[in-house]
C-alpha cells in the first residue's frame, strides 16, 4: 500500500493527545515519528488511569488506548532536554528530521532550547509545527488549555449544543474529542508544508490552535452570528423538525433513536410514507406539496413521531433499507467500533500490542488507493532509546555516560 510520508522523519516533543494524535496520523501515513519523552517522567498522559470515569488501560496488560491511540506507530526515546548532556542528542535528532512537532508552551520551549530559532539554527530546512490552546502569539500565547476549554467551551460548540434553560452545560461527547479533530488538522497542515517545501524549498512554520479548530468546526454558526450582528437565537435540539418533519431525531419503540436529515422534504416524503406503511399521508392535503409539508411541519412531525415510536430500531433498519432519503441509527461507541461500513474498509484496524495480543483501534479516516491501513502499536516508555541513539552513532561509553548523567533512559 502507498505510504505517502515514507522517508519523512518527524521529531515530536509533545504530550497528551492534541499534537501527538497528529504524529499518529503521520505515522499511519508512513512517517518515522520519534516521540521524545522525559527520561524520568515520560509523557504525562501515561500517568492517567481513568478518563471521564472510564479505565483507560487494560488491566494486567501494557495496552492503553489513551496512549496507543494517539501514539501508535511511533518510536519512543527517553531524553531529559533540560540537561546539558542531552543537547547533542537533541541536535542530532533535529538535524536528521524533516518536521519538528510540539505543543510545549513558548516559555517552556525557550527554556529547553526548542523554540523556532533554536531548532532552525540546527536545521534551517525543518518544518516547525506547533499546536497551542488559544493562539501562537499575543497575550494568550503562554496560556495552556485542553480541548474541553479551548475547543469545546470557548470555540462555540458547548453553548450551541446546550438547550435553552438547561441546568447543566453539555460536555464534549468523548475524551479528546477536539484533540483528535485538531490532530487531523495539524497533519494536513504539515502535509501541505512538506509539499510546499518540495516545490519551493521554503520550510514553513505551521501553527494550529484548539480554539481555531473549534471556531472552524462551528464556522457556519459563527458566520451567521457575524452576519446578524448578534448571538444566534438558541433553540431546543428537539425542535429540529420545526420546519421540516424529515429532519430531527425520533424515538423508537425500544428506546433507540433515528436521525433523519432529509433536507429536501418534498422529494423524499412520498417514499418515506410508503416505507412507514402510511402511503395516504403523501396525498394528504396538509402535506401534498413541499410548501404545505413545511407549513404544517409540526403536525407532520407529531405524526412521524407516533409512527416511529410504533416499531423497534431493528424493524426500522429493515424498513428503511435502500431508501433514498438520508437517515441513520444513533449509535453508541461500542456499535461504532462494530459498524459494518467501518469494518468493511478496515477503519477499525487490528494492532498487536506489546504482549502479542490482537487489539483494535480506530484508524484515521484518510485512505490511499482504497487500501485499509496497517497499524502498529504505540511504543512503551523509552522503548527505542538505544536503537535511535545507535542510528545517530551514539553507542558504547558515550551512551553509558548519557545514561549515568540522567540525560537519557
List the model feature ranges, each with a label:
Residues 1-199, 234, 380, 386-409:
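N-terminal helix-loop segment corresponding to the beta1-alpha1 unit
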Residues 1-9, 251-253, 335-409:
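Terminal low-complexity tails and localization/encapsulation signals of metabolic enzymes
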Residues 40, 133-135, 210-215, 254-256, ...:
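Glycine-rich beta-alpha junction loops
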Residues 58-59, 67, 233-242, 248-249, ...:
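Short Gly/Pro-enriched turn/cap motifs at secondary-structure boundaries
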Residues 154, 164, 183-203, 216, ...:
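Oxidoreductase and adenylate-handling cofactor-binding alpha/beta cores
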Residues 170-181, 203-205, 236-247, 258-261, ...:
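A short glycine-threonine-serine/GTX helix/turn-capping micro-motif
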Residues 176-191, 210-218, 264, 268:
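Mid-domain beta-loop-alpha active-site segment that forms a flexible
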Residues 246-323, 327:
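Aromatic-enriched alpha-helical interface/lid elements that frame and gate functional surfaces
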Amino acid at each position: 500500500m502507498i505510504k505517502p510520508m515514507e522517508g519523512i522523519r518527524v521529531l515530536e516533543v509533545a504530550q497528551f493527545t492534541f499534537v501527538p494524535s497528529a504524529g499518529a496520523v503521520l505515522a499511519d501515513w508512513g512517517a518515522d515519528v520519534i516521540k521524545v519523552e522525559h527520561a524520568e517522567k515520560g509523557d504525562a498522559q501515561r500517568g492517567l488511569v481513568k478518563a471521564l470515569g472510564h479505565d483507560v488501560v487494560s488491566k494486567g496488560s501494557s495496552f492503553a488506548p489513551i496512549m496507543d491511540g494517539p501514539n501508535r506507530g511511533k518510536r519512543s526515546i527517553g531524553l531529559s532536554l533540560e540537561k546539558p548532556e542531552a543537547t547533542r542528542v537533541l541536535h542530532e535528532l533535529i538535524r536528521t528530521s524533516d518536521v519538528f512537532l510540539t505543543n510545549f508552551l513558548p516559555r517552556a520551549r525557550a527554556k529547553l532550547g526548542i523554540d523556532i530559532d533554536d531548532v532552525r539554527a540546527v536545521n534551517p530546512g525543518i518544518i516547525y509545527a506547533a499546536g497551542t490552546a488559544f493562539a501562537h502569539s499575543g497575550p494568550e500565547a503562554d496560556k495552556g488549555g485542553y480541548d474541553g476549554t479551548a475547543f469545546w467551551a470557548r470555540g462555540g460548540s458547548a453553548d450551541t449544543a446546550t438547550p435553552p434553560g438547561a441546568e447543566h452545560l453539555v460536555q464534549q461527547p468523548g475524551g479528546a474529542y477536539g484533540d483528535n479533530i485538531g490532530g487531523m488538522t495539524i497533519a494536513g497542515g504539515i502535509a501541505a508544508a512538506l509539499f510546499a517545501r518540495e516545490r519551493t524549498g521554503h520550510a514553513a512554520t505551521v501553527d494550529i490552535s484548539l480554539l481555531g479548530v473549534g471556531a472552524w468546526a462551528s464556522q457556519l454558526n459563527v458566520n451567521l452570528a457575524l452576519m446578524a450582528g448578534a448571538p444566534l437565537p438558541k433553540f431546543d435540539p428537539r425542535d429540529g423538525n420545526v420546519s421540516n418533519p424529515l429532519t430531527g431525531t425520533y424515538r423508537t419503540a425500544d428506546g433507540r433513536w433515528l436521525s433523519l436529515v432529509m433536507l429536501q422534504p418534498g422529494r423524499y416524503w412520498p417514499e418515506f410514507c410508503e416505507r412507514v406503511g402510511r402511503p395516504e399521508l403523501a396525498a394528504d392535503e396538509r402535506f401534498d406539496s413541499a410548501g404545505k409539508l413545511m407549513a404544517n411541519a409540526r403536525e407532520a412531525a407529531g405524526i412521524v413521531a407516533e409512527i416511529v415510536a410504533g416499531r423497534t430500531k431493528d424493524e426500522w433498519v429493515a424498513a428503511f433499507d435502500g431508501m433514498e432519503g438520508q437517515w441513520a441509527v444513533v449509535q453508541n461507541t461500542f456499535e461504532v467500533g462494530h459498524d459494518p461500513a467501518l469494518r468493511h474498509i478496515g477503519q477499525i484496524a487490528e494492532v498487536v500490542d506489546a504482549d502479542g495480543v490482537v487489539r483494535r483501534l480506530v484508524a484515521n479516516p484518510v485512505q490511499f488507493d482504497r487500501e485499509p491501513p496497517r497499524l502498529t502499536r504505540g511504543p512503551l516508555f523509552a522503548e527505542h532509546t538505544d536503537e535511535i541513539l545507535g542510528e545517530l552513532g551514539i553507542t558504547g561509553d558515550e551512551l553509558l555516560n548519557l545514561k549515568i548523567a540522567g540525560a537519557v533512559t
